């Protein structure tokens, strides 16, 4: 069972929360454009990856199945970028603390599971889009 989502503190907060997207975010679109420009158009979006036994692992933002490369484009706020050290919202602190802990733990599990079946995992943080995408291009050139 999931956590109970608290009521938004105002209609404006509600509208902001409803507008948050989980796929095809601005940072994802930037990375995809950089990959196409660099000559790497053959990726899959939100491609399901299973273990050999069929157990579901995850759907990375971008995958190169033939190369076994999984790419996650993480927003600094939602995935708790270690460099940005974003503040936790002041209202509903318990809820947000638990949510962020679960997000970070889920990210760790995905990465560990993918590496366990031979995938290379590359995480690009929102605050480092250009550098992260450039590093990814170098990995793909190998």
Regions found by a protein language model. Name each.
Residues 1-142:
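Nucleic-acid endo/exonuclease domains
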């Amino acid at each position: 069972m999931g956590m109970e989502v608290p009521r938004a503190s105002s209609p404006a907060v509600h509208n902001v929360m409803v507008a948050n997207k989980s796929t095809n975010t601005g940072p994802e679109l930037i990375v995809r454009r950089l990959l196409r420009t660099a000559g790497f158009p053959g990726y899959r979006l939100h491609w399901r990856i299973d273990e050999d036994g069929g157990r579901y692992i995850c759907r990375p933002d971008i995958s190169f199945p033939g190369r076994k490369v999984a790419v996650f484009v993480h927003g600094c706020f939602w995935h708790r970028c270690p460099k940005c050290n974003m503040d936790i919202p002041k209202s509903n602190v318990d809820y947000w603390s638990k949510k962020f802990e679960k997000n970070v733990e889920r990210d760790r599990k995905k990465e560990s599971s993918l590496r366990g079946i031979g995938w290379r995992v590359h995480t690009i943080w929102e605050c480092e889009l250009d550098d992260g995408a450039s590093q990814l291009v170098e990995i793909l050139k190998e």
